């Protein structure tokens, strides 16, 4: 294995120089900020003196300073900031670590298995963020009835299952039909899902990526909106990513721009040189 379980089980792996050039990071300032402040306080988290929720939602000047410091220290290890191509890079064995979302991990693992590449997904021991996408009907919607029908349709257990199979992400629907369909008795892994399916679901053989154990969820928290601090966090993110192109690519861009400028000047000169002399007739 390129990455031992012991390494992958801690955010420290993103700062480990032995993985330099083999790490992909989500192009998401929220995820990056949360990851940095969590790892920066790994010792305090282990001691129980701080919580993941407090850390990820701390936008004080000191917290922002720490986040920027740790992200800059991590940056030399990063091969690229990705929004969607990370899962494909992992399946092609071009990256060893990818800070990614669970649904993308499901897709990548399935695709990788088809070509003989073994991937896995873990939530680091220090903790992480819990997030979700949701549908809402805005108050200015022109057809709220149709929107309601759509949401109700997506909440049907049979449709929710089809949607999960397609996108890899878990539906919020927690009916007996969903649980029955997702149980996999071939697995050695048992999860306490009583937080999701109710008290009777405290030892279930099920996919650990889509349905993590209660203990995993308890060390995670939601990132709240940055509010009036959004601009400051985005400024940090811009500074982190700003020179990520590297010297070689930067030089290449300058060369291309110079060549294009030269070509445009040359074409203009050609058009000018082909113009016929103009003769003037003076009337007396």
Question: Each PLM stretch: what is its role?
Answer:
Residues 17-18, 39, 74, 89, ...:
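Structured segments of extracytoplasmic/periplasmic soluble domains
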Residues 138-214:
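Mature extracytoplasmic/periplasmic domains
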Residues 1-94:
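Extracytoplasmic ligand-binding site segments that recognize negatively charged/polar headgroups
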Residues 281-282:
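Conserved small/polar residues in nucleotide/adenosyl-binding loops
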Residues 257-269:
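Alpha-helical transmembrane segments
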Residues 76-140, 180-181:
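Extracytoplasmic/periplasmic substrate-binding proteins
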Residues 240-255:
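Juxtamembrane/start-of-transmembrane alpha-helix segments at the extracytoplasmic/lumenal side
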């Amino acid at each position: 294995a390129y990455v031992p379980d012991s390494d992958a089980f801690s955010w420290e792996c993103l700062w480990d120089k032995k993985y330099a050039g083999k790490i992909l990071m989500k192009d998401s300032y929220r995820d990056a900020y949360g990851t940095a402040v969590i790892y920066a306080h790994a010792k305090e988290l282990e001691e129980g003196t701080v919580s993941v929720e407090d850390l990820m939602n701390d936008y004080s000047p000191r917290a922002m300073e720490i986040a920027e410091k740790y992200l800059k220290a991590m940056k030399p290890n990063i091969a690229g900031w990705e929004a969607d191509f990370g899962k494909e890079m992992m399946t092609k064995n071009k990256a060893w670590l990818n800070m990614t979302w669970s649904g993308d991990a499901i897709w990548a693992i399935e695709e990788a298995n088809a070509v003989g590449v073994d991937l896995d997904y873990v939530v680091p021991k220090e903790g992480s963020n819990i997030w979700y996408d949701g549908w809402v009907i805005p108050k200015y919607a022109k057809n709220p009835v149709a929107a309601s029908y759509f949401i109700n349709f997506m909440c049907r257990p049979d449709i929710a299952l089809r949607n999960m199979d397609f996108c890899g992400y878990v539906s919020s629907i927690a009916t007996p039909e969903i649980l029955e369909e997702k149980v996999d008795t071939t697995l050695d892994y048992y999860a306490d899902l009583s937080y999701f399916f109710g008290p009777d679901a405290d030892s279930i053989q099920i996919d650990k990526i889509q349905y993590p154990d209660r203990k995993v969820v308890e060390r995670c928290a939601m990132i709240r909106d940055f509010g009036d601090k959004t601009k400051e966090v985005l400024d940090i993110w811009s500074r982190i990513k700003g020179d990520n192109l590297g010297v070689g690519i930067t030089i290449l861009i300058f060369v291309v721009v110079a060549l294009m400028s030269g070509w445009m000047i040359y074409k203009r000169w050609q058009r000018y040189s082909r113009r016929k002399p103009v003769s003037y007739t003076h009337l007396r």
